[in-house]
Amino acid sequence: MDPRLRAPIFLPILTPETLQKKKQIKGNKTTIYKNGFMLFRSRLHKILNLSGDWAGASAKCSIIWHTLPQNVRLAWSQLAELSHYQDVRKQIAKLERILYSKRLNGHNNYKLHISRVQ
């Protein structure tokens, strides 16, 4: 018998990082957003999903985003930057209240039925 076969040599095997990662629990997931519009759109999609109004959701998000005042859009963008470092759910709730107040103050040139989400 070949002497090399008697003492096997274990070689390191490179495994992809995806196999070593554990599946995240959805409840503890903190998403990192690239910019303010993506954060805004994700929150609005969640609200639209809960209210059942999905007709043209992406177009509505874009229309609403462009009708928001510059300072509100800047606040969403700063919040998206902050999401890289910490959980921003409380701050998102504050900005959603601003969005609701804009909708209730006659800023309604788009058809959107939003139910209040706690």
UniProtKB/Swiss-Prot annotation:
Subcellular location, record wording: Nucleus
GO molecular function: DNA binding
Main localization of the protein described in the UniProt heading: nucleus
Alphabetically ordered keywords of this record: DNA-binding, Nucleus, Transcription, Transcription regulation
SUPFAM superfamilies, A to Z: HMG-box
GO cellular component, one term: nucleus
DNA-binding region, residues: 29-97
InterPro entries assigned: HMG_box_dom, HMG_box_dom_sf
Keyword Nucleus listed: yes
Role noted for this protein: Mating type proteins are sequence specific DNA-binding proteins that act as master switches in yeast differentiation by controlling gene expression in a cell type-specific fashion. Required for conjugation and efficient meiosis.
Other information: There are three genetic loci for mating type genes in fission yeast, mat1, mat2-P and mat3-M. Cell type is determined by the alternate allele present in mat1, either P (plus) in a h+ or M (minus) in a h- cell. Mat2-P and mat3-M serve as donor of information that is transposed to mat1 during a switch of mating type.
Name this protein carries in UniProt: Mating-type P-specific polypeptide Pc
Gene: matPc
